[in-house]
From Swiss-Prot:
GO MF terms held by the record: protoheme IX farnesyltransferase activity
Entry's EC annotation: 2.5.1.141
One GO term of the biological process aspect: heme O biosynthetic process
Function according to Swiss-Prot or TrEMBL: Converts heme B (protoheme IX) to heme O by substitution of the vinyl group on carbon 2 of heme B porphyrin ring with a hydroxyethyl farnesyl side group.
Additional detail: Carbon 2 of the heme B porphyrin ring is defined according to the Fischer nomenclature.
GO cellular component, one term: plasma membrane
Protein name (database record): Protoheme IX farnesyltransferase 2
Pathway annotation from the record: Porphyrin-containing compound metabolism; heme O biosynthesis; heme O from protoheme: step 1/1
First-level EC class: transferase
Family, similarity comment: Belongs to the UbiA prenyltransferase family. Protoheme IX farnesyltransferase subfamily.
Cellular location(s): Cell inner membrane
Bilayer topology: Multi-pass membrane protein
Encoding gene (name): ctaB2
């Protein structure tokens, strides 16, 4: 079916993951006072842009996708869909998404999404992924944009809460991506993609995974110390971070099967970030300085 091909080229799994984090950022900022139309416009607009980026990424990556067992059945590699059709599909989705964000949210949220799109398509996909071991680091910025955009769609400003979300989700991307690179090591090696495990070895990647999880754990609790989230969120953040760290440290055991271990680290990374996105939504709080700003605004407009 033609529809199925057009859907597959947009990587629905990635869209769904970004939708969850965007909604988490939005609801964190909304603090229970939800503008449902704005939420719908934000997540739909963002999802369309993410779908656009994924479709264009498929066009860019089809040569290396043909070399990787995991991606050899993608529609552009098999010829089930033409590059021209996929590119046109991506452009239309992107234009629709940006139009929805521009007219229904605010310039800051739209600008955040544009930043993420340019980083993912223009910097990561076109150059860094193929040429630098730091491609994962650069790509992590685009992966951290959805919750920030969701947050800024509500607040209209880039404040400490937005900065914490950017840091937190960027740090999460690193062990998540390195774990993929370890259990898909042969694929990345065959395609000549300079990810850390291929360039510097699996041991170096394991060390980086542990360090980034520690940094991520510290970043997650900053939402609580900043007054943006409550103790329910804190309990989940501490529990998931510690379990993820324990799992990562188990990779140093002599009898460890690196591929199986990396899969566990990868799958738990998804559980971790999904749990935190949900808890941000249900246990968000208004920090004192934001309450002061809102009180001042209410006095000004009253």
């Amino acid at each position: 079916m033609k529809f199925k091909r057009y859907l597959q080229v947009t990587k629905p799994g990635i869209i769904f993951g970004n939708l969850i984090s965007a909604a988490g950022g939005f609801l964190l900022a909304a603090q229970g006072s939800v503008d449902w139309w704005l939420l719908a416009a934000t997540v739909v607009g963002l999802s369309l842009v993410v779908a656009s980026g994924c479709a264009i990424n498929n066009c860019i990556d089809q040569d290396i996708d043909a070399k990787m067992a995991r991606t050899q059945k993608r529609v552009l590699v098999t010829g089930a869909m033409s590059t021209k059709a996929a590119l046109a599909h991506g452009v239309v989705l992107g234009l629709a998404g940006f139009a929805l964000l521009w007219f229904c949210t605010n310039p800051l949220a739209t600008g955040c999404v544009l930043f993420g799109f340019v980083i993912y398509v223009g910097v990561y996909s076109l150059y860094m992924k193929r040429n630098s071991v730091y491609g994962t680091l650069v790509g992590s910025l685009s992966g951290a944009v959805p919750p920030v955009a969701g947050y800024c769609a509500v607040t209209g400003r880039f404040d400490m809460g937005a900065a914490i979300l950017l840091l937190m989700f960027s740090l999460w991307q690193m062990p998540h991506s390195y774990a993929i690179a370890i259990f898909r090591f042969k694929d990345y090696e065959a395609a000549g993609i300079p990810v850390l495990p291929v360039v510097k070895g699996i041991s170096a990647a394991k060390q980086q995974i542990v360090l980034y999880i520690l940094a991520f754990a510290a970043a997650t609790v900053m939402l609580v110390f900043g007054g943006y989230a409550g103790y329910g969120y804190l309990a989940v953040a501490v529990a998931t971070s510690l379990w993820w760290l324990k799992m990562a440290l188990s990779g140093y055991k002599r009898e460890t099967d690196d591929r199986a271990w990396a899969r566990q680290v990868f799958f738990f990374s998804i559980i971790t970030i999904t749990s935190l996105s949900v808890m941000m939504a249900v246990d968000g709080q208004t920090p004192p300085h934001s309450r002061a700003v809102m009180t001042a605004d209410a006095g000004h407009y009253g």
